[in-house]
């Protein structure tokens, strides 16, 4: 497949625990490069996922609390103190994408996959999409993974590994955050 047939940027959209990270894992590590490019128009993969940013905030807040300081981002129940932090996560995705464009390793033949999930209570996808940079929107393809809520909830409960709650593939949300 010619490099110009490779999608430069794909946003993977779905509910939490709908399989977004598993799709990325499959595309990146389970099939040959030639199959991925020919069948899916996906090149070498660069992933920008907001979960590592989010998890880092939880860790930083826990550390601050242990130091006797106020938590910055989240309350003790894991909810953001300010809904603006959902917007900040999108701005961090924009920033990481801009930085990746400067990376000489990320060139034609690469596909950047953006991954995040949003609920209605803080603006949903409409709000998140409105904050994506022009650099992203100019090249964006969107792949929606349609998974029933019940299946997403089941997978969310099953995938949790208490030994690795920071894991992209093994973290979960409390049921009330899934609604």
Task: Please place each PLM-identified region on the residue numbering.
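Glycine-rich phosphate-binding loop of ATP-dependent small-molecule kinases
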Residues: 1-179
